[in-house]
Amino acid sequence: MLPQDPSTEPTPADDAAPVDSAGQASAPSPADPEGVAHPRRIRSFVRRAGRTSTGQQRAIDEVGPRMMVPYAPQPLDWEATFGRKAPSILEIGFGMGETTAHIAGLRPQDNFLGCEVHEPGVGALLKLIDERGLANVRILQHDAVEVIAHMLTDDCLDGVHIYFPDPWHKKRHNKRRLVQPPLVKVLAARLKPGGYIHCATDWEEYAHQMLEVLSGEPLLENTSTAADGFAERPDYRPVTKFERRGVRLGHGVWDVVFRKRAA
């Protein structure tokens, strides 16, 4: 097991920065629903300049070779990747990985594939995987939209987690938001019948956009019976430190859970 070290917090993205400096793809455009990489695509994230700590780098070097999956534009062999056949959950943008590790620990029967471009976050989750002995998590350090388009096949996923994606709160930046109809259409195709998409955000206007976009996908149905359409927080999703702080300040958090209709 790797030695402990303080976690490095991610540096918030500068919302004035228009693109990811690495030039990776992001949310697919309506003209390109399969998310094929294109250098002029509007991006839903920027690469943050957070420092990778010594412990995180050690985890990348020592744990990464076992737990990281290289990007390749060909279908992922889930059974070979995880060494077993099990329900498959995709997490898009896991941040520093605490929620991913928590859920994976609660649900050892499921396989979790996390996509994250931020290197300190990758290192932080690899440390947690090592410290907690998690065998059911793999990491792809690549733009999730390209992974979904080129590595995932239809009817391969049992669930998708999208927690606290960048809200791009300035109106002129709303088009950069991850949860948009073209991406949801592809995710719905990748889900098995009965599979779910679970989104969470602390930005109310984005929460309503998520609800509207998911409601507009014919393959999906809302699991909530509440009048406003939002779901109670599922027991498996932990309340993060950031979330607790927001609640103390009077901020809300909204969960949206949709399921793919039976074939």
From Swiss-Prot:
Residues reported in the UniProt entry to bind substrate: 170, 202, 240-243
Region (Disordered): 1-38
InterPro entries: SAM-dependent_MTases_sf, tRNA_(Gua-N-7)_MeTrfase_Trmb, tRNA_methyltr_TrmB_bact
One Pfam family in the UniProt entry: Methyltransf_4
Annotated catalytic residues: 166
One GO location term (cellular component): tRNA methyltransferase complex
Residues in coiled coil: none
Enzyme class: transferase
Family the UniProt entry places it in: Belongs to the class I-like SAM-binding methyltransferase superfamily. TrmB family.
HAMAP family: tRNA_methyltr_TrmB
Known function: Catalyzes the formation of N(7)-methylguanine at position 46 (m7G46) in tRNA.
Protein name stated in the entry: tRNA (guanine-N(7)-)-methyltransferase
UniProt lineage: Bacteria, Pseudomonadati, Pseudomonadota, Betaproteobacteria, Burkholderiales
Gene assigned in the entry: trmB
